[in-house]
Each structure stands twice: as C-alpha cells, then as structure tokens.
A protein has these predicted regions:
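Bacterial N-terminal signal peptides
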Residues: 9-19
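Bacterial N-terminal signal peptides that target proteins for export
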Residues: 1-11
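Aromatic- and Gly/Pro-enriched, solvent-exposed loop/edge beta-strand patches characteristic
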Residues: 52, 76, 82-223
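Short, surface-exposed beta-strand/loop patches at domain edges
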Residues: 188-193, 197-264
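Extended extracellular/luminal ectodomain segments enriched in beta-structured repeat modules
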Residues: 62-71, 82-84, 191-192
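Boundary/junction segments of secreted and surface-exposed precursor proteins
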Residues: 23-48, 103-107, 263-264
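Non-catalytic, beta-strand-enriched accessory regions in extracellular/secretory proteins
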Residues: 46-60, 255
Length: 264
C-alpha cells in the first residue's frame, strides 16, 4: 500500500509539473499585415509540367519557438479555390547558413554566375518543411474577394543575369484568398532569422497562386528584409522581386502577406 501511494504521488507530481510547463508557455504571434495590391509573386510546388517557384519573406525569432500554424494571403490568377490540390510551407534560414559559399564570389557581394548577390537571401536549402501531400500540414481556404487587382506580378519572368530585370509581368486580377494552415507536427525553431515560403498547387496547367505583397516600409520590423524568389532553373540562387527583377530608378521593395502563431 505504501509503494502504491508513493507511485501515485510521483504520478501526480508529474502531472502538476507538466501542467506548469504548459501554462508557462507564452503565446507567439507575428504578422506582416494585409495586402496592398502592389505585387503578386508566384509560389508553387513542381507539378503538371510547371517548374517549382518559391517566394520567400523573412521573420525573426528572439527565442525558441513552437510554430503551430500560419496564414497567408494571395491571388488565384486563372483559377479558383476548388482547384487547389496541395499546400506546402518551407522554412529557410538566411544565407550563408545551409549554403555552399564556395560557389559565390565571396565577401562582400557573394554574387554567382546567376544572380547579382546572395547577401540577405534565403539559404540554398530549406531548414524545415510541412506539406499537405505527406500529411504534415492541414489547410483551409477562405475567399476574401472575387476581383482583387495587383499592380504588378512575377510568374514566369525569373531569369539569371543578365536577363533578370524584366520589370515584372504587369497587372493581374483574380480571387483574393487567405490560406490557414496547421503544422502537424509543429515546427520547432531556435532563435534566429528565417524566411517563410508558402506554396500552392492548382489543378491543371493554367492557374497560379500569387502571394500578395504588404507595405514596406514604414511598417517593417527592425531587421526586415524583402521578398526573394527563385524557380527550379535558378536554384540554389535567389533574386529580389524588387531591386533585381523590378529594378526601377528607385527600386521598390515588398513584403509578403503572412502571419505565424504558436508558443515560446
């Protein structure tokens, strides 16, 4: 009987400690804000003869964080929400982490034969991923508007130097959607600077998901970078959507519309 009471006491103490640990976790939330209609950047897994495209925007974690979900807002160009077949999220660290620096020119520019610079770009390879195709991500789609315009777009015009400065592919319109995702399992990230890459596959060859931009600045956070993009032909390098592709006299810069939630 004494041994049983001791075991029960240990078990109860374990539950109390577990509850205390759970209760001590602080909620985490990060958001770049609502779309501004300036830019739509394609971002999709490889499928049906389409090259993979990755559009990436950054966020900073000041402590170990347990990411449980995310939301991102985009435009369905020549497609509808019923045609969405796959959603994926990739997390990258900032170059030169997870990257082969020897293939670049080195400091301070870190250029390659394909791109002007890798400074402040995402790394060569992803740090972690979640994908509805393998069951590690669940998603829901909400239509926010049926005729949302974006003043410029980047879809197919992602080229290595010297042809990178296409100025973009012009205005587009389509359904504005918000994609809410749950990570299963959650993504555990140590304190660091990261890039968030949302990707959406639409059925068929014509449609594309375009990630919508948000204002930058004055709403940028300290250390904020800008949207970078690449396709499978440019991999492992990246281009800046503003500055490299839309290289106006005063180059624009863009953030992507997304939010993250979890605990830390």
């Amino acid at each position: 009987m004494q041994r049983t009471r001791y075991s029960l006491a240990v078990f109860t103490l374990g539950l109390v400690l577990a509850g205390a640990t759970s209760a001590s976790a602080d909620p985490f939330f990060f958001s770049t804000g609502a779309p501004d209609g300036r830019m739509g950047a394609a971002s999709r897994p490889e499928s049906h003869g389409k090259l993979e495209i990755e559009a990436a925007d950054d966020f900073i974690l000041e402590s170990q964080t347990h990411l449980e979900g995310a939301s991102f807002t985009g435009l369905l160009f020549q497609g509808g929400p019923g045609e969405i077949r796959q959603v994926a999220v990739e997390i990258y660290r900032v170059f030169p982490k997870d990257s082969d620096v020897t293939r670049t020119s080195g400091a301070p520019i870190f250029s390659t034969p394909k791109v002007p610079t890798r400074v402040n770009s995402p790394s060569d390879v992803a740090f972690d991923t979640r994908d509805s195709a393998d069951g590690t991500l669940r998603f829901t789609v909400t239509v926010l508007g049926y005729d949302f315009p974006a003043a410029n777009s980047v879809i197919d015009g992602i080229h290595p130097i010297p042809d990178q400065a296409t100025k973009g592919e012009g205005p587009v319109q389509g359904q504005e959607i918000r994609v809410d995702v749950v990570f299963d399992p959650p993504i555990d990230l140590p304190a660091d600077h990261y890039f968030f890459v949302p990707q959406v596959t639409l059925q068929g060859r014509g449609g594309n998901f375009l990630w919508l931009s948000t204002p930058r600045p004055p709403l940028a956070f300290l250390g904020d970078l800008q949207i970078w993009i690449r396709n499978a032909d440019l991999d492992p390098d990246w281009l800046r959507v503003g500055t490299d592709i839309v290289d106006d006299a005063t180059p624009p810069t863009f953030n992507g519309s997304f939010s993250l939630n979890g605990t830390r």
